[in-house]
Amino acid sequence: MPPGGGGPMKDCEYSQISTHSSSPMESPHKKKKIAARRKWEVFPGRNKFFCNGRIMMARQTGVFYLTLILILVTSGLFFAFDCRYLAEKITPAIPVVGGILFFFVMGTLLRTSFSDPGVLPRATPDEAADLERQIDIANGTSSGGYRPPPRTKEVVINGQTVKLKYCFTCKIFRPPRASHCSLCDNCVEQFDHHCPWVGNCVGKRNYRFFYMFILSLSFLTVFIFAFVITHVIHRSQQKGFLDALKDSPASVLEAVICFFSVWSIIGLSGFHTYLISSNQTTNEDIKGSWSNKRGKENYNPYSYGNIFTNCCVALCGPISPSLIDRRGYVQPDTPQPAAPSNGITMYGATQSQSDMCDQDQCIQSTKFVLQAAATPLLQSEPSLTSEELHMPGKPGLGTPCASLTLGQPTPPSSMPNLATEATLSDIMPLKDEHGGHQFLTPDEAPSPPRMLGAGSPLAHSRTMHMLGLASQDSLHEDSVRGLVKLSSV
């Protein structure tokens, strides 16, 4: 293209009206920037979250801090007043072993307290409504104060029938071995118990860490208690018992704390060792779900029949992922901005379609084919004879793309006046069906009002549509017949 011819085209392209810009007919939607909220901020349970949702604990954490204080104070006194003397007089391995036990105890305690125990997500309102509907259909509608039977399901696990209870708070059927914690207000998978000493529920995802914590804590307590007594006895042999107590008063406090706590810790460790070896939970053992007192037919369907296998599954099996997305973002319901309705886009689309014949594009819509076939007839109508009007196969119609000239035609003198004779009953739409195609008049194309010039093709077609067509029935019939033949070819 020559350089001179590219200028007007570029000016035309740059002067196009943007359909996305605001206009007086539109009210632009002003979006307010709202800070995205994490899902832990709207979590329905009674839990506390720290570090942006990474740490999850129960709401009652007072006893947990007491546990931390007891462990830190006892271990700190031991390392400060006893380990130095024991390392010099007996062996330097004592503080090393004590340090390893201390860090292992603290690590397992924090992992138990800060992790998700296996909380089950609650049902959404749609899921809850659908589940309630299914339950009502299964139980039947209640009337006259009649309460339907308990909402339970029965499943068979290793030949044993297990009931699944419906949780009215979470609106779900709890899976096997799950239970609802009244303190945390959550359904926990493979629920064992709620432990205030660790400040969290004990369930499927943190049970192994809880067991390692109480087991290592029992070893640490016995270790500290034993070497505190050794320290006092060793000093009493040199200076006497009272002088030994005066030289190391912290040893007395350590011995008292360890003496009163070691029995409960060792007992708890032994009890959970039994539960792990039989693949049971504290909740199942308290309820006696698989007790032999109910008969030989009542056996534990979750046990592998081997103590070693049960321990390996509980302590070395894979940890299931968390089912709640604590750190995900809450999706806000943002309104979608409405599409512009000022007619500019529709007009631009109509104008681009009207230029198809000028670009020698033979793929056209039916309204442009009709316009190409009808316009030459109306322009040459004064020179046609009565015989030529009744010739449906006359080749004077021409082809749409080759002979279509959208000029301003002169209406024939035989046309009636619009102001006096045209009525709505005189308007006959040019519609016909042939081969599954429907041919529409040019005026049926959507176009915005008050935006077409007097000399445009669409304005011309609208003017010709308003002419009185009652006296030109034969002319329109010939136009339709010719158009049908063109489309069939």
From Swiss-Prot:
<keyword id="KW-0256">Endoplasmic reticulum</keyword>
<dbReference type="GO" id="GO:0018230">
    <property type="term" value="P:peptidyl-L-cysteine S-palmitoylation"/>
</dbReference>
<keyword id="KW-0564">Palmitate</keyword>
<keyword id="KW-1133">Transmembrane helix</keyword>
<keyword id="KW-0597">Phosphoprotein</keyword>
<dbReference type="GO" id="GO:0019706">
    <property type="term" value="F:protein-cysteine S-palmitoyltransferase activity"/>
</dbReference>
<feature type="transmembrane region" description="Helical">
    <location>
        <begin position="209"/>
        <end position="229"/>
    </location>
</feature>
<keyword id="KW-0808">Transferase</keyword>
<dbReference type="InterPro" id="IPR001594">
    <property type="entry name" value="Palmitoyltrfase_DHHC"/>
</dbReference>
<feature type="topological domain" description="Lumenal">
    <location>
        <begin position="82"/>
        <end position="89"/>
    </location>
</feature>
<dbReference type="GO" id="GO:0000139">
    <property type="term" value="C:Golgi membrane"/>
</dbReference>
<feature type="topological domain" description="Lumenal">
    <location>
        <begin position="230"/>
        <end position="255"/>
    </location>
</feature>
<comment type="function">
    <text>Palmitoyltransferase that could catalyze the addition of palmitate onto various protein substrates. May have a palmitoyltransferase activity toward the beta-2 adrenergic receptor/ADRB2 and thereby regulate G protein-coupled receptor signaling. May play a role in cell differentiation and apoptosis.</text>
</comment>
<protein>
    <recommendedName>
        <fullName>Palmitoyltransferase ZDHHC14</fullName>
        <ecNumber>2.3.1.225</ecNumber>
    </recommendedName>
</protein>
<feature type="transmembrane region" description="Helical">
    <location>
        <begin position="90"/>
        <end position="110"/>
    </location>
</feature>
<feature type="transmembrane region" description="Helical">
    <location>
        <begin position="61"/>
        <end position="81"/>
    </location>
</feature>
<feature type="modified residue" description="Phosphoserine">
    <location>
        <position position="456"/>
    </location>
</feature>
<feature type="domain" description="DHHC">
    <location>
        <begin position="165"/>
        <end position="215"/>
    </location>
</feature>
<dbReference type="InterPro" id="IPR039859">
    <property type="entry name" value="PFA4/ZDH16/20/ERF2-like"/>
</dbReference>
<feature type="topological domain" description="Cytoplasmic">
    <location>
        <begin position="1"/>
        <end position="60"/>
    </location>
</feature>
<keyword id="KW-0333">Golgi apparatus</keyword>
<keyword id="KW-0472">Membrane</keyword>
<dbReference type="GO" id="GO:0005789">
    <property type="term" value="C:endoplasmic reticulum membrane"/>
</dbReference>
<feature type="topological domain" description="Cytoplasmic">
    <location>
        <begin position="111"/>
        <end position="208"/>
    </location>
</feature>
<keyword id="KW-0812">Transmembrane</keyword>
<feature type="transmembrane region" description="Helical">
    <location>
        <begin position="256"/>
        <end position="276"/>
    </location>
</feature>
<feature type="topological domain" description="Cytoplasmic">
    <location>
        <begin position="277"/>
        <end position="489"/>
    </location>
</feature>
<feature type="active site" description="S-palmitoyl cysteine intermediate">
    <location>
        <position position="195"/>
    </location>
</feature>
<keyword id="KW-0449">Lipoprotein</keyword>
<comment type="similarity">
    <text>Belongs to the DHHC palmitoyltransferase family. ERF2/ZDHHC9 subfamily.</text>
</comment>
<dbReference type="Pfam" id="PF01529">
    <property type="entry name" value="DHHC"/>
</dbReference>
<keyword id="KW-0012">Acyltransferase</keyword>
<feature type="region of interest" description="Disordered">
    <location>
        <begin position="434"/>
        <end position="454"/>
    </location>
</feature>
